[in-house]
């Protein structure tokens, strides 16, 4: 009923009722590329019933990056790196999967960054003192641990902290 509505949930339960409304004016979707492609198709099929062409925006299959300037707020950068990389185990579309940081800035925060990572608690998601828990499934575990192994084997990369992966009791990275 409003001008802008945030509607999280099962896409199958949301999309059809929205597209049945002739006033449907647009969607900003965040999720998988495959689901977004299906959504495009459904919208195209609905065009004859709609009063106007809806605006369609999709953020699919990507993750964010962090760019730091040489005179950035270093504490703010440190927090952005930590939260962007580790909240929700890095499994969200806004997760920071890479960072572009001047060497002079990196050398100034590297030690504190490592210290802060070592303070992060990991374990059972039912224990709310844990900041990080297991990744979603075996496929995600295999993919992420593969990236870590590739970094460890690449002579141009330095893994400065962590790198361990354990799937004996959940998919922990």
Name these PLM-found stretches.
Residues 1-15, 47:
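PLP-dependent aminotransferase-like
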